[in-house]
């Protein structure tokens, strides 16, 4: 082999060696870069997972209020309740809307609902009464069959007697002595209203009716006198307002007359006082004048 061929083969080997080294370095750099990229992606994934977890925890901790609560608060602010129609037992009341009424109205009635007061309604009056019978009514609202009714005959110092009648209206025949009844209104076996009645005898009822006309006559007389006095005072005030100048002049003249009289009396008093204070004549001067005359 010639020296020239040997030099060419050596140069070729060196070139191939450098190419192999360059390939190994490039491959190693690619692996390192991939590893770094994979590590970065892993860290990014972990960061995203942590961010998502933190966001979920924040969302759980700071959850917005439920729409039902908000709607309920809005309803409370926009709705008012009217007065109950009764002071005891069962009645109705109006539900009034204060915002969002049709036609731009400030208030409008949305519905009518049931309302309840204290159960004890005391002593009531019958719906009708005659000399033979009387009709009593329990506390109720429409419809009548919604509630249950329990009538009792009250006895002094004894247990009450529960009657068979379970309707809202009870008709009682008058007897020789007064009677007392009680009606309990029940809703789902719960007493919601109680009222009592006194059933008088026919003679007591006649006496009560005979005493009423005298009371009514006295009341009418008092009311009539009161109305007449009020009308007279009103007309008097109107007359004074219309003729205020004449009234003022009249009262001015009335007021000036006592002043003139008081001034005259004071002048008279001063005159009488001055006359009383004049000096009397001296007795010596009278004697001198008499001697001179002689």
From Swiss-Prot:
<comment type="subunit">
    <text>Interacts with CYLC1; the interaction may be relevant for proper acrosome attachment to the nuclear envelope.</text>
</comment>
<keyword id="KW-0597">Phosphoprotein</keyword>
<feature type="modified residue" description="Phosphotyrosine">
    <location>
        <position position="269"/>
    </location>
</feature>
<protein>
    <recommendedName>
        <fullName>Sperm acrosome membrane-associated protein 1</fullName>
    </recommendedName>
</protein>
<feature type="region of interest" description="Disordered">
    <location>
        <begin position="258"/>
        <end position="294"/>
    </location>
</feature>
<feature type="signal peptide">
    <location>
        <begin position="1"/>
        <end position="29"/>
    </location>
</feature>
<dbReference type="GO" id="GO:0002079">
    <property type="term" value="C:inner acrosomal membrane"/>
</dbReference>
<dbReference type="GO" id="GO:0002080">
    <property type="term" value="C:acrosomal membrane"/>
</dbReference>
<feature type="glycosylation site" description="N-linked (GlcNAc...) asparagine">
    <location>
        <position position="31"/>
    </location>
</feature>
<keyword id="KW-0968">Cytoplasmic vesicle</keyword>
<feature type="transmembrane region" description="Helical">
    <location>
        <begin position="222"/>
        <end position="242"/>
    </location>
</feature>
<keyword id="KW-0812">Transmembrane</keyword>
<dbReference type="GO" id="GO:0001675">
    <property type="term" value="P:acrosome assembly"/>
</dbReference>
<feature type="topological domain" description="Extracellular">
    <location>
        <begin position="30"/>
        <end position="221"/>
    </location>
</feature>
<feature type="region of interest" description="Disordered">
    <location>
        <begin position="42"/>
        <end position="70"/>
    </location>
</feature>
<feature type="compositionally biased region" description="Acidic residues">
    <location>
        <begin position="46"/>
        <end position="58"/>
    </location>
</feature>
<keyword id="KW-0472">Membrane</keyword>
<keyword id="KW-0325">Glycoprotein</keyword>
<feature type="compositionally biased region" description="Acidic residues">
    <location>
        <begin position="283"/>
        <end position="294"/>
    </location>
</feature>
<keyword id="KW-1133">Transmembrane helix</keyword>
<keyword id="KW-0225">Disease variant</keyword>
<dbReference type="InterPro" id="IPR037878">
    <property type="entry name" value="SPACA1"/>
</dbReference>
<comment type="function">
    <text>Plays a role in acrosome formation and establishment of normal sperm morphology during spermatogenesis. Important for male fertility.</text>
</comment>
<feature type="modified residue" description="Phosphoserine">
    <location>
        <position position="256"/>
    </location>
</feature>
<feature type="topological domain" description="Cytoplasmic">
    <location>
        <begin position="243"/>
        <end position="294"/>
    </location>
</feature>
<keyword id="KW-0732">Signal</keyword>
<feature type="modified residue" description="Phosphoserine">
    <location>
        <position position="290"/>
    </location>
</feature>
<feature type="compositionally biased region" description="Polar residues">
    <location>
        <begin position="258"/>
        <end position="267"/>
    </location>
</feature>
């Amino acid at each position: 082999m010639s020296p020239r061929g040997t030099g060419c083969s050596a140069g070729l080997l060196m070139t191939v060696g450098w190419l192999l080294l360059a390939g190994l370095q490039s491959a190693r750099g690619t692996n390192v870069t991939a590893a770094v990229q994979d590590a970065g992606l892993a860290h990014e994934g972990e960061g995203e997972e942590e961010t998502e977890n933190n966001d979920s925890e924040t969302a759980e901790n700071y959850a917005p209020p439920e729409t039902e609560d908000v709607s309920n608060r809005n309803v409370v602010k926009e709705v008012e309740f009217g007065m109950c129609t009764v002071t005891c037992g069962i009645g109705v009341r109006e539900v009034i809307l204060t915002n969002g009424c049709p036609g731009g109205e400030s208030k409008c009635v949305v519905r009518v609902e049931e309302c309840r007061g204290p159960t004890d309604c005391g002593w009531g009056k019958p719906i009708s009464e005659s000399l033979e019978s009387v009709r009593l009514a329990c506390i109720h609202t429409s419809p009548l069959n919604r509630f249950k009714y329990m009538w009792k005959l009250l006895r002094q110092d004894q247990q009450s007697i529960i009657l068979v009648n379970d309707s809202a209206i009870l008709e009682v025949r008058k007897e020789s002595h007064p009677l007392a009844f009680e009606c309990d209104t029940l809703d789902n076996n719960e007493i919601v209203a109680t009222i009592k009645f006194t059933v008088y005898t026919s003679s007591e009822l006649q006496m009560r009716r005979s005493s009423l006309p005298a009371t009514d006559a006295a009341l009418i007389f008092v009311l009539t006198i009161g109305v007449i006095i009020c009308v007279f005072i009103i007309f008097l005030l109107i007359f004074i307002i219309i003729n205020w100048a004449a009234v003022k002049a009249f009262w001015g003249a009335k007021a000036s007359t006592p002043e003139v009289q008081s001034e005259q009396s004071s002048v008279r008093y001063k005159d009488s006082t001055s006359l009383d204070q004049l000096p009397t004549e001296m007795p010596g001067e009278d004697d001198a004048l008499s001697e001179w005359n002689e």
